[in-house]
Amino acid sequence: MKVLALRHSVAQVYADTQVYTHDDSKDEYENAFLISNLTTHNILYLNYSVKTLQILNKSGIAAIEIQKMDELFTLIRCNFTYDYIDDVVYLHDYSYYTNNEIRTDQHWITKTNIEDYLLPGWKLTYVGYNGSDTRGHYNFSFRCQNAATDDDAIIEYIYSDELDFQSFILKKIKERMTTSLPIARLSNRVFRDKLFKTLSVNHDKVVNIGPRNESMFTFLDHPSIKQFSNGPYLVKDTIKLKQERWLGKRLSQFDIGQYKNMLNVLTTLYQYYDIYHEKPIVYMIGSAPSYWIYDVKQYSDLKFETWDPLDTPYSNLHHKELFYINDVQRLKDNSILYIDIRTDRGTMDWKEWRKMVERQTTDNLHIAYKYLSTGKAKICCVKMTAMDLELPISAKLLHHPTTEIRSEFYLMMDIWDSKNIKRFIPKGVLYSYINNTITENVFIQQPFKLKTLKNEYIIALYALSNDLNNREDVVKLINNQKKALITVRINNTFKDEPKVGFKNIYDWTFLPTDFETNGSIITSYDGCLGIFGLSISLASKPTGNNHLFILSGTDKYFKLDQFANHMSISRRSHQIRFSESATSYSGYIFRDLSNNNFNLIGTNVENSVSGHVYNALIYYRYNYSFDLKRWIYLHSTGKASIEGGKYYEHAPIELIYACRSAREFAKLQDDVTVLRYSNEIENYINKVYSITYADDPNYFIGVKFKNIPYKYNVKVPHLTFGVLNISEQMLPDVIVILKKFKNELFGMEITTSYTYMLSDEVYVANISGVLSTYFKIYNAFYKEQITFGQSRMFIPHVTLSFSNEKTVRIDNTKLYIDSIYLRKIKGDTVFDMTG
């Protein structure tokens, strides 16, 4: 949802839009809670409070002040990510298709012939890093830019088996127009940039597990972050390959040679970061014009020095000349060298051309070895061709996508590799590597071993759920790692599937109850965004490829109502109850009936089950930004930090009742996952709360009334306001609590309206209006370790007779309290008080 704050109402009506006017009788937190549970996508918030907007944004719900109609029109028609700290809106708006254009934020693409293969009459537009060049389109009171691009489709095409780009991009645009927006993926770059900048400032050592190419620009400015990936393809790994011949397969209609060069250099750069943890000088020989340097410089201040007879416009220092082996002495330490020397074939005979290529390959290798033979802190990536070669066994082979698969591949070496044992590799084996291997990632660092790190902050986004990892080891890491942000695939199946397929892999699935963490926040993507200064206008699809975000060691843990809070907890319930269900009271009715409380009079105002816990369980797929386990734990320990709002502290037994209702709901819906989740949350409640039951009571609290509007034949009709199992030494403590609640007890608005048979030969009158006070007193007794209340639900009633009688219905009648007393069962009254 998105909340657009206005000082004045607007005359125009918008689809899927609701108006909310700030309620001055409620504080900012209550207003935020009410807004968050509205069911439309767009909320026009009138007479707004800035504090309420802050609360919503911290909760991950995009909430923005609107000053002009242009701002309203722009934000209401698309989704966006909002940086509420820096006041920047990142639109995810594809309406630019109506200009017959596709967009990119990678400059090198604009220098290719891609426009020859677009839809007829279409063009390509460069929009800058996260759409920064579009800021001029929006003259708004906040900074606004459109981060939507088609780079995801272009890159997917490059790695696909499709050759016809026009057909491919047409299909992708049609898909984009007919399927739900993948909002998390679109906002992820904004999130990653914010996340790693924040963590790099706050933590000395940061470890990142499982980066992919989507992050290849994100980490350019973070050389100290330690990366873990799937490891490199080494020369010695070719021993498994059978010999093949030249294939000559075209991968792309438009020229992607620059993309290949960029990936080669970035792979080398990140290998340098991995070893030396600082930025090198980047030397490049023969890869002009290297327009992609412009892209790299949008993210980092890396320095490039280049050699080529052709211009390299974005190099810091370009030598418009050939590079010879004697020029190696001009190259400094603390550097990487990219060698991409290859003479154009022109009209040369094929055999002559082949001889020249092999000779240049040998020369390139000599330059690489000479560069690595002296000095320190150096890594080299050199262009190779398939030929009989001796190569160091520990050198890394690279084969990033290029326009055509021919004879070309690349070799990456550091100083140690260049001095290592060399092995003869036949030409046919290298062709086998080239024909069958595409390097899919610029991050080729070693895999992460699933163990805790004492002084490091671990980040693992979408990296650990894969079933190649041992599930128990993943759980153990999350339980024990002190500082981390780790994601795992949420179990949003209905049959409690232990793993689910995604693309061509399988992921383990998890619920919050799979982890034993008492210092971590377990939330959703949008809940995590709020913690890092971002909010989003569209939540993830409830049955999509969704993840739990687990933050350990955060200073936000105790701020229960500010982050990963209960905002939107009733939203799905409202959507169902006010549209599909038999009555808008369905949730209240079901919760009472499923706990054998059949008095439904006033069920919507006097309910004995925690609606928070019930909704958090049965609709967890729709809102798991609310960290239910943390909410339970902090209340059980009394450590919850509450900033504001009308906050009602549930008695632990209300939480148990909610689990029982959720369990009943799950059985009716055949939802095996919710059934397990409810059981495990109930077990967790029993673990963190020391709940005892007075199922064998020796005292009770009685309420005697001045008026009973029914016939009765018991000696003194009374309401049993709970039973206790206590020693005589505890009587003074019980009496102190009763005295403390005297005014509230006598102030209860107690009513009755019918009689019924509670059981065979037990004829009673219903009682309404006491549950709220009952649970407050329950909490007071619980905190003093006084056993109060039974394991079955407390159903308020007055016993009238121990015989079978007919039900009587009367007008709702108020009952007036005469006295409240504490009496021993089958014994004497030990305390009483009157109003």
UniProtKB/Swiss-Prot annotation:
Function per UniProt: Multifunctional enzyme involved in mRNA capping. Catalyzes the formation of the 5' cap structure on the viral plus-strand transcripts. Specifically binds to GTP and displays guanylyltransferase and methyltransferase activities. Has affinity for ssRNA but not for dsRNA. Capping activity is non-specific and caps RNAs that initiate with either a G or an A residue. Together with VP1 polymerase, forms a VP1-VP3 complex positioned near the channels situated at each of the five-fold vertices of the core.
Keywords: GTP-binding, Host-virus interaction, Hydrolase, Inhibition of host innate immune response by virus, Methyltransferase, mRNA capping, mRNA processing, Multifunctional enzyme, Nucleotide-binding, Nucleotidyltransferase, RNA-binding, S-adenosyl-L-methionine, Transferase, Viral immunoevasion, Virion
Key word S-adenosyl-L-methionine present: yes
Region spans: 2'-5'-phosphodiesterase activity: 693-835
Residues at the active site: 718 (for 2'-5'-phosphodiesterase activity), 720 (for 2'-5'-phosphodiesterase activity), 797 (for 2'-5'-phosphodiesterase activity), 799 (for 2'-5'-phosphodiesterase activity)
Leader peptide range in chain numbering: none
Reaction equation(s) it catalyzes: a 5'-end diphospho-ribonucleoside in mRNA + GTP + H(+) = a 5'-end (5'-triphosphoguanosine)-ribonucleoside in mRNA + diphosphate; a 5'-end (5'-triphosphoguanosine)-ribonucleoside in mRNA + S-adenosyl-L-methionine = a 5'-end (N(7)-methyl 5'-triphosphoguanosine)-ribonucleoside in mRNA + S-adenosyl-L-homocysteine; 5'-triphosphoadenylyl-(2'->5')-adenylyl-(2'->5')-adenosine + 2 H2O = 2 AMP + ATP + 2 H(+)
CDD domains tied to this protein: capping_2-OMTase_Rotavirus
Record protein name field: Protein VP3
Region (N7-methyltransferase activity): 171-245, 429-555
Domain notes: Contains a bipartite N7-methyltransferase domain, a 2'-O-methyltransferase domain and a GTase/RTPase domain. The C-terminus contains a phosphodiesterase domain that degrades the 5'-triphosphorylated, 2'-5' linked adenylate oligomers produced by the host cell in response to IFN stimulation.
Residue ranges of the region described as 2'-O-methyltransferase activity: 246-428
Family under the similarity heading: Belongs to the rotavirus VP3 family.
GO cellular component: viral nucleocapsid
Superkingdom assignment: Viruses
InterPro entries per record: VP3_Rotav (IPR011181)
EC number of the protein: 3.1.4.-, 2.7.7.50, 2.1.1.56
Protein species of origin: Rotavirus A (strain RVA/Human/Japan/S2/1980/G2P1B[4]) (RV-A)
